[in-house]
Amino acid sequence: MKAELIAVGTEILTGQIVNTNAQFLSEKMAELGIDVYFQTAVGDNEERLLSVITTASQRSDLVILCGGLGPTKDDLTKQTLAKYLRKDLVYDEQACQKLDDFFAKRKPSSRTPNNERQAQVIEGSISLPNKTGLAVGGFITVDGISYVVLPGPPSELKPMVNEELVPLLSKQYSTLYSKVLRFFGIGESQLVTVLSDFIENQTDPTIAPYAKTGEVTLRLSTKTENQALADKKLGQLEAQLLSRKTLEGQPLADVFYGYGEDNSLARETFELLVKYDKTITAAESLTAGLFQSTLASFPGASQVFNGGFVTYSMEEKAKMLGLPLEELKSYGVVSAYTAEGMAEQARLLTGADIGVSLTGVAGPDMLEEQPAGTVFIGLATQNKVESIKVLISGRSRLDVCYIATLHAFNMVRKTLLKLENLL
């Protein structure tokens, strides 16, 4: 099946908004085995939008339009598509009720007549409810071509796609089953090299590597009759892949950490903390609370995390954590001594089972004769205090901090897995 994505909005063409929806939708279509052959952006103009829809209908089986579902006159996606299909616009009962509920809590004057446009769908279409907004989406097939209309804001589009569109398309079109393997501690180029014979000779299942910031994923996909057969085929391939070794001789399984498109090192670590009923704290310098805010973003985080420290300066490390100032000056803040001291003191002061610390040089300048991207990560438990040094070179400050937190979560995850192996 050939699909085409059409982003509607003059603000995309003028560069005011980045079209992140295209990447998200392309990934979702790939998961379903639907090939996206074309991506188009068009302004808020009926004539040009009609032209784009006409072209897409001549070369694609599935046309997905994003944006232009709002209440204003320049929001004309549904109106233009309805005109092209020679269909009327009708009101969706559920969407109308949502409008009623929304405006019932506001001043009567706030409900202007143009808001009703958001509850309209093309006659004969399947409505796609909007859980986070007011503009309803829709799906319709006419003359063998399927059309989807989605809201533009990613906060509305993503839930609608994940919860409404993907299940709908899965039932109608897809026989593709996928499994995503996640890796940390190996680059895409080395992973592809190690698995080159599998990738070059792939037929079914297929293997697709993707580089993320600080990590790599492999999507394994197969077309088969049912989930049970897919699980068997993908499981066999996974076992073969993970039996390989890195160029340094390390088992590939050692740098594999989990499954799923939406998974993360932080989530894996959080779930292990919950599983083993362990608490954690952190003392952060260069990351300025990123580790802690990431951990706290998971529902139920209070089960494992009660608080921590952000000690950006040397003086605050001494004041808040009780580390000897003269020793800090002697060893420097970018050191194993400081990382281990921060982790241990954070653990002792909060009574947590595990203490983590991050200290280093975010860049772009050197600090204490250490290059940008030098990070020390400490970890303290009741029985052991240790640290690792990582060098995250050629990255922005934000990337250095983000990747440093990945290393910290991975360090905690490995510690918890050792505990798992002892049980």
Swiss-Prot record:
Domain of life, source organism: Bacteria
Cysteine-cysteine disulfides: none
SMART domains named in the record: MoCF_biosynth
Pfam hit, one: MoCF_biosynth
InterPro entries on file: CinA, CinA-like_C, CinA_C, CinA_KH, Competence-induced_CinA, MoaB/Mog-like_dom_sf, MoaB/Mog_dom
Protein family according to the UniProt entry: Belongs to the CinA family.
HAMAP family associated with the record: CinA_B (MF_00226_B)
Protein name: Putative competence-damage inducible protein
Species this chain originates from: Streptococcus pyogenes serotype M49 (strain NZ131)
GN (gene name): cinA
